[in-house]
């Protein structure tokens, strides 16, 4: 067993567990939700299961987690030797399960001689290196959070909207209050209204519980 951010460290405890013979590794996590984090999380789990020739079960906290300014999606993943066997839908409910072929994993480890003979010590080799100025050729995206592909962009926007709406939904359920949103005409207040509507939909509440107050300012125009 390892806990949450253990998986994100340079030397996760699961490495020692696998070298000691563990074939099923479990991560009890409380990973908050951020834009694009689900893909990175999925790659970590899949990669670690492949590297260690093991099954990796990742169980993250859901919306029942006590929180103030974080949102938890309940993202659960079961991977076996690099293959995702099962994955839950974020912000969903229910139990995730799958069959794990432990005997197959053990057989693969027996064939992988380097896994058995792996030495946990390291060797230092000193060498000289001449530092030269190198021209950078890597493309740096000026808008890294906005996918160029329309389908991925729409998915990203919906993800952002859902993360914010789930946070507000939890607060609305806790207080039982209605919502008052100030509308200045800018993008921020427009997004706030859209998030509020989505949160009310998730709660199954009537939109009449939302009061939008126009707050025109010096930048307000007919287009606004």
Regions found by a protein language model. Give the residues of each.
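ATP-dependent adenylation/nucleotidyltransferase module used to activate substrates
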Residues: 6, 129, 152-224
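Flexible inter-domain linker/hinge segments
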Residues: 1, 5, 95-172
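Composition- and surface-driven signal marking solvent-exposed, interaction-prone regions
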Residues: 14-16, 40, 89-91, 112, ...
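Short acidic (Asp/Glu) and glycine-rich catalytic loops that position anionic groups and cofactors
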Residues: 25-28, 141-146, 173, 177, ...
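CN hydrolase (nitrilase-like) catalytic-core segments centered on the catalytic cysteine
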Residues: 8-96
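Generic beta-strand/beta-sheet core signal
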Residues: 2-4, 27-29, 57-59, 79-81, ...
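Hydrophobic positions within alpha-helical membrane elements
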Residues: 11, 86, 106, 191-193, ...
